[in-house]
């Protein structure tokens, strides 16, 4: 394949996804299945016929990842319906703190389901809904409520132990299946934490004002309901940092299953486990559909020769791996900004092979940074942004993602800078992977 053909096929894929992104206004749930169709069209244009097998087999690499996220979603939603999160929320708002400290604790509370599942929408549908309704009832300006829940959901997705957008490229790296999102606890924490601290310091007083303790929030049960969370936290930390001392006990699916069973025993109120699990899975379905579509694009680019041709040309040209990672990472951000998160995933699929190949042997953290750029596109997107989803969930209209971003320029720049650092210097920061 010559370079012109590679660019043509790349343009076909990007054009199809761009068109459906515009037509469906960034609705990820509608666009994700159409990305598979874009893969079929690209294969047809390449003269390879109707290649259903290749377009659909890529997502199977994420079967383990799906289990991690689905088990986490079932566990976190059970904590929502059995009263554990309500008990925690009463503690969050029941004490007087400085605005910055209160914002920090509130963001961590909202982000908790996101940390467990690696998704933003799990937070929006549970703790975000809970905190958002409370703040609206307290008379807070609607745009500020949407902002707090949006940032909380974004931070929850980015903070460890899991981050679905970062898991996609790190696991799919250069087609070398299977991969694993292990060793990334400290790197993803270091990437996200500075932006979180900056946001809380700058937005605490602006958004919350002088925070007053509220002891009237309804709560049931006792601190015993926190046992499942505590056990899961200990098991996650041991799994990530004491793996050389403790025998392997099954990873995240088993950890979350243990938490799920404990949450049926130590609870504030009764909950149907089957309904909780099903509802929890629904909260993460769209984001999981996107990584399956992403895997389909990776496989399609491999099939039609786009990845191999472009990678070979860059190798021949002697382009530095850090430059390739930086340019493609910024293209992910730009594509997500203009056309939404599904388009960012498609550009990220191209970046997966090119960045890993150009940084062979030390590609782990640049790949994580590409995933973080995809995650950030949910915050930046002009259509189908995370803020719009939050507004729909809370029943708030007229608040756009652009408005939230404009009010938090410094936060946005700090997070972008952290992503750039890992894109450019990720090879030198590999010592952070434990």
Model-derived regions, located:
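N-terminal alpha-helical transmembrane segments of multi-pass membrane transport
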Residues: 1-70, 78, 89-90, 202-212, ...
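Membrane-embedded alpha-helical segments and adjacent helix-loop junctions characteristic
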Residues: 49-134, 271-358
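Long, contiguous bundles of hydrophobic transmembrane helices that form the permeation core
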Residues: 1-17, 37, 41-43, 183-276, ...
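Membrane-core helix-loop-helix motifs of multi-pass transport proteins
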Residues: 1-2, 133-225, 363-365, 388-434
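Membrane-helix interface "capping/anchor" motifs
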Residues: 19-33, 137-143, 269-270, 333-346
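Membrane-interface helix termini and inter-helical loops of multi-pass transporters
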Residues: 49-58, 170-180, 241-248, 301-316, ...
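Structural signature of hydrophobic alpha-helical transmembrane segments
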Residues: 2-11, 63-68, 121-124, 185-191, ...
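Alpha-helical transmembrane segments of multi-pass membrane proteins
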Residues: 100-115, 138-158, 184, 321-334, ...
């Amino acid at each position: 394949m010559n370079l012109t053909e590679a660019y043509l096929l790349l343009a076909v894929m990007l054009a199809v996804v761009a068109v459906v992104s515009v037509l469906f206004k960034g609705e990820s749930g509608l666009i994700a299945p159409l990305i598979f169709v874009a893969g079929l069209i690209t294969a047809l244009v390449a003269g390879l016929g109707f290649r259903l097998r290749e377009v659909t087999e890529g997502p199977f690499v994420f079967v383990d990842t799906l289990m991690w996220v689905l088990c986490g979603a079932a566990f976190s939603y059970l904590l929502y319906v059995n009263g554990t999160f309500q008990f925690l929320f009463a503690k969050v708002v029941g004490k007087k703190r400085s605005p910055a400290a209160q914002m920090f604790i509130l963001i961590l509370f909202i982000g908790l389901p996101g940390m467990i599942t690696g998704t933003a929408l799990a937070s929006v549908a549970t703790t975000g809904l809970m905190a958002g309704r409370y703040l609206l009832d307290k008379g807070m300006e609607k745009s500020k409520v949407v902002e707090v829940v949006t940032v909380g959901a974004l931070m929850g997705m980015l903070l460890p132990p899991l981050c679905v957008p970062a898991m996609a490229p790190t696991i799919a790296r250069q087609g070398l299946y299977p991969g694993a999102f292990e060793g990334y606890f400290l790197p993803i924490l270091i990437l996200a934490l500075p932006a979180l601290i900056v946001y809380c310091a700058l937005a605490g007083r602006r958004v919350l004002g002088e925070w007053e303790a509220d002891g009237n929030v309804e709560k049931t049960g006792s601190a015993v309901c926190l046992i499942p969370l505590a056990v899961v936290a200990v098991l996650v930390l041991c799994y990530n940092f004491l793996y050389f001392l403790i025998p392997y006990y099954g990873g995240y699916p088993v950890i979350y299953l243990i938490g799920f069973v404990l949450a049926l025993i130590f609870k504030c109120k009764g909950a149907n486990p089957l309904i909780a699990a099903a509802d929890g899975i629904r909260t993460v379905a769209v984001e999981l559909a996107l990584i399956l579509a992403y895997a389909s694009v990776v496989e399609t680019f491999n099939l039609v020769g786009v990845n191999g041709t472009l990678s070979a040309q860059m190798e021949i040209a002697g382009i530095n791996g850090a430059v390739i990672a930086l340019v493609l990472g910024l293209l992910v951000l730009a594509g997500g900004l203009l056309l939404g998160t599904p388009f960012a995933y498609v550009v990220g699929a191209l970046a997966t092979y090119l960045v890993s190949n150009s940084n062979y042997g030390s590609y782990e953290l640049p790949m994580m940074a590409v995933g973080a750029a995809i995650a950030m596109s949910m915050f930046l997107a002009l259509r189908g942004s995370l803020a719009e989803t939050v507004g729909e969930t809370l029943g708030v209209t007229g608040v756009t993602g652009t408005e939230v971003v404009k009010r938090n320029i410094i936060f946005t720049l700090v997070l972008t800078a952290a992503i750039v650092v890992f894109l450019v210097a990720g090879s030198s920061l590999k010592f952070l992977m434990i």
